[in-house]
């Protein structure tokens, strides 16, 4: 086992704080409408330019192992916020840095780290309650567009496109972002269905970079039961091979010999194939398979209908223009089903929704309805260069995630104002334990950090902006960094999804609390390079051997 280097107490916290500061300082320059770009070197090709906090955070790796541990724990804040809310990563990083800095000072002054953490947690719970109370539901398409515009760094065209896509496919519909071959950024609405089952084997993957299986102009075989052998299917498989088209198999399960045979055929290139489990369970699974059959214009191979696998012909298979499968989801685009059949099925599901008395059943029926009727919206991002397209795509994805979050939990005034206004709720909390109270005060101060940073990135003194906002009675009064003016944030359309603000604070306080309570750090000592082998000499004198 390699020797370890161990740091304790103040030394450990100082090194960790240096790492936190390096990562946070690189990320926080991107915050707000006047945030700056960060240029990231790539091992090959042109450097990447981004204003996306989590993209910057993921690229940072420090030489000093202890500093790097601090940086990586802060990176976790950005990643977690991105996974849960899809946006707000820079805000989360700024909040975490503010809490860690003040927390480290308090610990250095002799306060109990565990009591500080209790105070931090108490204050954060009060802020979250306050944000939930202030959140207003998103009522109109215009509000959706405003949320999208703010998250896309003030790009109104992106906000409008996302609102348009959500209007077409519904809030529950599927919206994907792709790169466009042309200069234009456009929205394309495609009929399609997405369900939460991924490929059964990674060997089905066709795009190694994205780890997805993409099949074009594909046949779809739907089977109600498990497939453990392929003998009965050989006639239909041969017909598919002769047609030269790929095949998607959706069944209760594909196991053992059947899966192995499909994988071998896929790797040898004989049959472009992918297999996924059927979505849902029990009767619901059968209903969803029937939905897919209607969408693709195929037939469900079911014992109830007296159908056997050996009797299946290629005409019984469904068809789709494209199928995309990743580790967790399958999306069927442009199924070949008849419009009249799909509409009849939609009508049938709507009737079931009206009749059902169970909330759970109603929710599941509505999910099926969204899948059948919703379709898929594709936002194709264009630009003059590859660098521009990638940067714009980052912003579109952020904006899309933010609008989804806004629809889920509502909106609050943007520009860090919601957190600043929550100071009132935290200020009402008192605790007899001075160390717990110090933890509450740490959060009280940290709530100012996002507004300060947005102002500083716009070249304005942060303290002045914070003071001016807090002087005003209006809850929606704030600083518009774009115009460098004080405005009613909601009226101006500067709004944040409540979910993004909540998640940013929760994740920031969670990781910051761990950093503040850290008392020792352990890292591997660098291995010394082994000495080089000595150069080999000759074989010495061979005399005395009697020759």
Swiss-Prot record:
<dbReference type="InterPro" id="IPR001844">
    <property type="entry name" value="Cpn60/GroEL"/>
</dbReference>
<comment type="subunit">
    <text>Forms a cylinder of 14 subunits composed of two heptameric rings stacked back-to-back. Interacts with the co-chaperonin GroES.</text>
</comment>
<feature type="binding site">
    <location>
        <begin position="87"/>
        <end position="91"/>
    </location>
    <ligand>
        <name>ATP</name>
    </ligand>
</feature>
<protein>
    <recommendedName>
        <fullName>Chaperonin GroEL 1</fullName>
        <ecNumber>5.6.1.7</ecNumber>
    </recommendedName>
</protein>
<keyword id="KW-0143">Chaperone</keyword>
<dbReference type="GO" id="GO:0140662">
    <property type="term" value="F:ATP-dependent protein folding chaperone"/>
</dbReference>
<feature type="binding site">
    <location>
        <position position="51"/>
    </location>
    <ligand>
        <name>ATP</name>
    </ligand>
</feature>
<dbReference type="GO" id="GO:0005524">
    <property type="term" value="F:ATP binding"/>
</dbReference>
<dbReference type="InterPro" id="IPR027410">
    <property type="entry name" value="TCP-1-like_intermed_sf"/>
</dbReference>
<keyword id="KW-0067">ATP-binding</keyword>
<comment type="similarity">
    <text>Belongs to the chaperonin (HSP60) family.</text>
</comment>
<feature type="binding site">
    <location>
        <begin position="30"/>
        <end position="33"/>
    </location>
    <ligand>
        <name>ATP</name>
    </ligand>
</feature>
<dbReference type="InterPro" id="IPR018370">
    <property type="entry name" value="Chaperonin_Cpn60_CS"/>
</dbReference>
<dbReference type="Pfam" id="PF00118">
    <property type="entry name" value="Cpn60_TCP1"/>
</dbReference>
<feature type="binding site">
    <location>
        <position position="496"/>
    </location>
    <ligand>
        <name>ATP</name>
    </ligand>
</feature>
<keyword id="KW-0547">Nucleotide-binding</keyword>
<dbReference type="GO" id="GO:0005737">
    <property type="term" value="C:cytoplasm"/>
</dbReference>
<dbReference type="InterPro" id="IPR027413">
    <property type="entry name" value="GROEL-like_equatorial_sf"/>
</dbReference>
<dbReference type="InterPro" id="IPR002423">
    <property type="entry name" value="Cpn60/GroEL/TCP-1"/>
</dbReference>
<keyword id="KW-0413">Isomerase</keyword>
<dbReference type="InterPro" id="IPR027409">
    <property type="entry name" value="GroEL-like_apical_dom_sf"/>
</dbReference>
<keyword id="KW-0963">Cytoplasm</keyword>
<dbReference type="GO" id="GO:0042026">
    <property type="term" value="P:protein refolding"/>
</dbReference>
<dbReference type="GO" id="GO:0051082">
    <property type="term" value="F:unfolded protein binding"/>
</dbReference>
<feature type="binding site">
    <location>
        <position position="415"/>
    </location>
    <ligand>
        <name>ATP</name>
    </ligand>
</feature>
<dbReference type="GO" id="GO:0016853">
    <property type="term" value="F:isomerase activity"/>
</dbReference>
<comment type="function">
    <text>Together with its co-chaperonin GroES, plays an essential role in assisting protein folding. The GroEL-GroES system forms a nano-cage that allows encapsulation of the non-native substrate proteins and provides a physical environment optimized to promote and accelerate protein folding.</text>
</comment>
